[in-house]
Amino acid sequence: MEPSSPQDEGLRKKQPKKPLPEVLPRPPRALFCLTLQNPLRKACISIVEWKPFETIILLTIFANCVALAVYLPMPEDDNNSLNLGLEKLEYFFLTVFSIEAAMKIIAYGFLFHQDAYLRSGWNVLDFIIVFLGVFTAILEQVNVIQSNTAPMSSKGAGLDVKALRAFRVLRPLRLVSGVPSLQVVLNSIFKAMLPLFHIALLVLFMVIIYAIIGLELFKGKMHKTCYYIGTDIVATVENEKPSPCARTGSGRPCTINGSECRGGWPGPNHGITHFDNFGFSMLTVYQCITMEGWTDVLYWVNDAIGNEWPWIYFVTLILLGSFFILNLVLGVLSGEFTKEREKAKSRGTFQKLREKQQLEEDLRGYMSWITQGEVMDVEDLREGKLSLEEGGSDTESLYEIEGLNKIIQFIRHWRQWNRVFRWKCHDLVKSRVFYWLVILIVALNTLSIASEHHNQPLWLTHLQDIANRVLLSLFTIEMLLKMYGLGLRQYFMSIFNRFDCFVVCSGILELLLVESGAMTPLGISVLRCIRLLRLFKITKYWTSLSNLVASLLNSIRSIASLLLLLFLFIIIFALLGMQLFGGRYDFEDTEVRRSNFDNFPQALISVFQVLTGEDWNSVMYNGIMAYGGPSYPGVLVCIYFIILFVCGNYILLNVFLAIAVDNLAEAESLTSAQKAKAEERKRRKMSRGLPDKTEEEKSVMAKKLEQKPKGEGIPTTAKLKVDEFESNVNEVKDPYPSADFPGDDEEDEPEIPVSPRPRPLAELQLKEKAVPIPEASSFFIFSPTNKVRVLCHRIVNATWFTNFILLFILLSSAALAAEDPIRAESVRNQILGYFDIAFTSVFTVEIVLKMTTYGAFLHKGSFCRNYFNILDLLVVAVSLISMGLESSTISVVKILRVLRVLRPLRAINRAKGLKHVVQCVFVAIRTIGNIVLVTTLLQFMFACIGVQLFKGKFFSCNDLSKMTEEECRGYYYVYKDGDPTQMELRPRQWIHNDFHFDNVLSAMMSLFTVSTFEGWPQLLYRAIDSNEEDMGPVYNNRVEMAIFFIIYIILIAFFMMNIFVGFVIVTFQEQGETEYKNCELDKNQRQCVQYALKARPLRCYIPKNPYQYQVWYVVTSSYFEYLMFALIMLNTICLGMQHYHQSEEMNHISDILNVAFTIIFTLEMILKLLAFKARGYFGDPWNVFDFLIVIGSIIDVILSEIDTFLASSGGLYCLGGGCGNVDPDESARISSAFFRLFRVMRLIKLLSRAEGVRTLLWTFIKSFQALPYVALLIVMLFFIYAVIGMQMFGKIALVDGTQINRNNNFQTFPQAVLLLFRCATGEAWQEILLACSYGKLCDPESDYAPGEEYTCGTNFAYYYFISFYMLCAFLIINLFVAVIMDNFDYLTRDWSILGPHHLDEFKAIWAEYDPEAKGRIKHLDVVTLLRRIQPPLGFGKFCPHRVACKRLVGMNMPLNSDGTVTFNATLFALVRTALKIKTEGNFEQANEELRAIIKKIWKRTSMKLLDQVIPPIGDDEVTVGKFYATFLIQEHFRKFMKRQEEYYGYRPKKDTVQIQAGLRTIEEEAAPEIRRTISGDLTAEEELERAMVEAAMEERIFRRTGGLFGQVDTFLERTNSLPPVMANQRPLQFAEIEMEELESPVFLEDFPQDARTNPLARANTNNANANVAYGNSNHSNNQMFSSVHCEREFPGEAETPAAGRGALSHSHRALGPHSKPCAGKLNGQLVQPGMPINQAPPAPCQQPSTDPPERGQRRTSLTGSLQDEAPQRRSSEGSTPRRPAPATALLIQEALVRGGLDTLAADAGFVTATSQALADACQMEPEEVEVAATELLKARESVQGMASVPGSLSRRSSLGSLDQVQGSQETLIPPRP
């Protein structure tokens, strides 16, 4: 998160400027002269920091916006009086803003101080706007003066000002600096800018590649169209726009009589849409990526060159560009937004909501308690009254008192009755019956409103009126009852009650107003619809729904600030649009452009339209045409639209989704919190109800209960069972088999992990268990043991049988797709009919077999008890019935034939991965239920309002001058294309709009299309023009109607639909996680562990041959990379420079360049082949790609040469001799077009170069891997719908100018799929729906009866298209989004946390140490390797050596017998320690748990790999951890000696003391440190390091960190932490130890090269190693300084024969195969201090190490060499390995046990190594050490008086004994420095 911190600081500085001025330390001087005492500055400060000042400025900005909006732009720079007045007003605003800026500058200083005016971004914006305003004003004055002197120049000079004046529109942005919540939204958008920039690069890259491909393939193809012969009139059918044609080939032929295909046409969209040059090609590709108008471009290309293959280009473009890359934007924004919101949440918004709920619950409790109390009072009073009557005495019989008593009693009675009655009311209001009554009334109310429609009968209107009044009175009664029963205070506490009250009051008001006639019923009827909101009352008892509604209301706040931002954004662009296009949208062709910028409201609507993306391209084309068409200045207009579209549609609208996803997660957590409470209650009940069970059993029950909610929302078939996992060593079984718990016993189903994205099959490995034969008999005749039944069972469960059936399912599906929908009786269909019979019989046999095996349906486990089997049965039954009924005319049979389409669904039951995706989709649908409900309610409400507003108003006459149906008769004249010479006579028709609001259902349909953003501008303008009922439209009659649509779009389309999408995404992600709920690893840990297990080392090929090496060196150098990068860029530029109609020279040059580039890239390939050899070269996928491209390019060059050679005879086409009818333009070398693509593909190589984009790409490919089953599901969906479409709509005639035409139809399977793909992208799907509904013309070749020409199509189309659109747009495409958001969360993740993307670095650096990719390196290289990898994975080069070693102790990878560590083990250990996976607690237990988890998640992990990564318990393991632990201990010994030598100046010789000090070191310093290290707690260590370094710096003692392997200076930055050569010179080899270079001034003498040849050096060595210091009780102090002290590494052990090589190898061999299992025995035996020394037991599990190892037996040596040399050789070196003598071992083990390292104490090998290290450090022979140790033990025994301590060693007593022994030598212990 570091990168974001400066912005945060900026924000912190910015925000206080307005609200908290006191915080700002004001600079002492402003503008170099004004001090704080200066009166002018004082005044400015007080004004600027005066609260109302801010408000005044905001109001001024607002007024300025209003002024800008009222301005009316006019064509040709005309003006009216209003505009002139506004321009004068402009000066006033300018003055105000200038004064404000000046005062702020005087108050805060201008630039140089910390918080000066220009240091805030918002102020910079203000300043620029003010400055430009002043500058413009000055220029205008200059213009005026000039125009007075030279009148002609005014026009020219005025233009400059107009451009500058456009900047005024930025003023509304100043509102942002005044509203803090806006800044939060903006900041989260700004934070996302970096990852968004990467995505933008990727999009740009795609656009460039596709643009160049388009340029190569479609250049100049769009300029031919059909003209009438001999004229320039384009020949088109009615309603059809002109489109390209082709003279030959499979393009569009000209069919109209007297027309021909010829060139010279500017092209579609006035020549804007084409691929003739790079710029327009990019524009066209970008327009396709936005999924708006892409099918038009595809159809034009089809018309021009035929429809065989252009679809590949466009479909891939949409899939990659729109579905994938643009969804990344969403991933990034939602990630950023969640982070921003989490910060806000930590301030407790969510908490407040929780508390509020709690409070309300408490309050309800109190209220009911108080009312209960009142009732009790009433009861008491009744009893009291009786006693009062009984005991009333006759003495008080005075009349006055009696009268008074009566009043008092009356009041009392009244109060009592009131209380009783009120309590009764309270009970009534709270009862369920009352609730359902109210719901019933609400439903009736809804019904009465929904029954309204156009042309309804009078009685219905009366009925609705009466119902309205009755229901209103009922609602009023309900409200009053509630108020009385609950009391006003409690009533108004509920938000729903307040809302209810508002609705009722508005209803009463409406009734009064209508009755009195003060208001038209229309405006008020909208109020009546508000009553529908009462429907939301249902949510009261529906927890999850009410939580959803609460979270929606909650997100209104965050949405409000976003809406404000959106509104500002729209205003700014609308104002800018008015400046640019105001008054310019009037063209020659008399067609009115509705989306224009001629006034402010209209500009707002146009900008909003572009924002929703509907038809934005046509608005842009108009803008380009307004500036003179597709030539230089006009094209620049597209920049405005592209920026508007990108910022608005991609960024702002995706923030909506981000907010939605965010809030849903919140609603989920609310619901789950409540569920948790319920569970808690249940658990309490359970434990109360289990008196006779033991505690343990209760806990089992509790656990079971805990596991239950996890499965919620998952269908039972998909419940998870934990796989019992067997390993050779241990069996880890589920401790509570499910049968223990009643009611949890499930059917024997194969387990299916539930997840939306099926894992790669490797992880899923579903072992299907054969379901046993059920107990009962099948068909009452076959018993379970019957041979026939057993045989059937065997067949049914055989894999070959399943595969056989799957094959048949596939074949039968293919047969369905191959049918001919038009000609039912064709030969093809007859053949397919026979096949159908075969398939059906096979399926019937399968079902009979299965029923025989499992029984039909009577008993448990029978065939029909499974939903998927019922589906199978249905499909087969349908096939059988339709075979029986032959005639296809019967409508029943038609439906049955269509139902055969469900056959592919049978595959679901057989492909497990697919089955589980389907289940996931069902779960998602179930979970989405709530959202659907809320959305439907809102939709219904808007539909009712729509009916009130627009019923019967969408009629029109095609002759616009006629207003009613009566007038709309006869004929009228039309001028074609506005040309008065061309007249045409047409009949008048009274038309009803396709989408209208005449009744609630039509209204809901119309609104649904609006919510999909398709065709809503047409509907909107239709509504704006609407007049009275049954009247024609009036232009711009009611512009305010736009508000209805805009509110609907924002509420439903932006917000609810996004929440819907968000819900799908959240559900899928949760489903993905449920699979791993009880695996204890989170997603990131899983991904990293999976990477560590699956990764393989890279080969790093370095040639041996010197010449080859030279080539290799060149090819791998970065300069070569940059050179190739530059060449590819050049190649791109050359390709982009081509254009249509280019000159001959240009053609020639581009051909030569192409050859040159091909030669260069071929050379690159040859060089690389030489450098890497074939195996190395083809090992890298990028190289394979290069290779293919080079081969393709060479073929391309050869073909081009042949082509030019044959050009004289007409190119390659003429080889066949058919050249007569080919014009040169047509033969545009199409044969070589395919190979031309290879030129373009070179660009893709750029991807391998850019780091950020490469990571994106990597994740991209990874997310493709996650999609196989999702893709399969989509394929199935498309298949089924395509086949249904062919059966239903295949016979509709293809009519040009309608939506079912030559390019878009259901007549063949591929066409049907393409049409569906078009619908899925939302391209005018509602028009296709209308074109497929009933009453369409039939295809002339189909089999319709005479007189039935117009009977094709069916109204089933409504269900078909709506269901398809819903499934596609909301579910399926969101699966894509969910997968992408899952995989791309790294884009916004905190980079300091280790993630899978960090792990590639490890592979790269490992390859340098292991170039052959053997997967092993010397353990001594590990430390250097890890210090070269940056954190969070490695240690980084600044990590002190000691910390690095300690981390290695914590990582504890297994060490192989040859002294190497493996690749996977090292990577796994790194991941494990970095992410703290099972690092706490007992290490062995943790290892076993982790093994079990890995086996459970990745079932196919080989045991070998698992043992490598986590050795099993029984293993005699040697680990790197122990290796480094001995060195840490040794290092601590040395520090003590060093300290003692410094203190005394000489080295004491008393051996026992030395040994004792060494033991104290182990116990007090080394052991705790190692213990902490192993438990992974390194934070304290690092803090210590830091503290010590600082302390040392203060004292100016430049000491060195105690480095183990050479010295590392922690305070001087190493200039070169590791010279490249050192990769192979192992700095850790102890036989010839290499020191890293030193830079510290402390050491005066150099390090000795070899102690044998240099006597002085030898003396020094002895001196340096001879320093022994004793343990001091001042433990903490020592811990403090243990790291920073001046110490020398002992340079090499090879010098002293006795303690040298042999000893080392001896000690480390002892680390060998003797390990943990004997821990218990050791602990038991070793710690018996009373035992005589000579009886000290040998380390129990250890083979006596004195025996020399047999020849060939492998033992580990720490120098990394195999020790299988002959024993003689060893003795000749004088290094016979010895066991540590018992006394030493005993003492060391005691020390280790006391230090808390029991496991290491139990490891005999480790003890041996430690004792050797002790001897080395003290520079004593092991025998001497043993003698000293024996003395120590004797001394201790004498002190203890030979008293033996029973049992295990008590830490206190042993310490006591040591202390007493030590007391005698107290004088020798030096204090610590």
From Swiss-Prot:
III repeats (start-end): 786-1068
Catalysed conversion reaction: Ca(2+)(in) = Ca(2+)(out)
Tissues in which the protein is found: Detected in skeletal muscle T-tubules (at protein level).
Chain segments carrying region Dihydropyridine binding: 988-1077, 1337-1403
Intramembrane segments: 280-301, 602-623, 1001-1021, 1312-1330
Location of Phosphoserine modifications: S393, S397, S687, S1575, S1617
Pfam families according to UniProt: Ca_chan_IQ, CAC1F_C, GPHH, Ion_trans
Region (Interaction with calmodulin): 1522-1542
Annotated InterPro entries: CAC1F_C, GPHH_dom, Ion_trans_dom, VDCC_a1su_IQ, VDCC_alpha-1_subunit, VDCC_L_a1ssu, VDCC_L_a1su, VDCCAlpha1
Protein name stated in the entry: Voltage-dependent L-type calcium channel subunit alpha-1S
Gene that this sequence comes from: CACNA1S
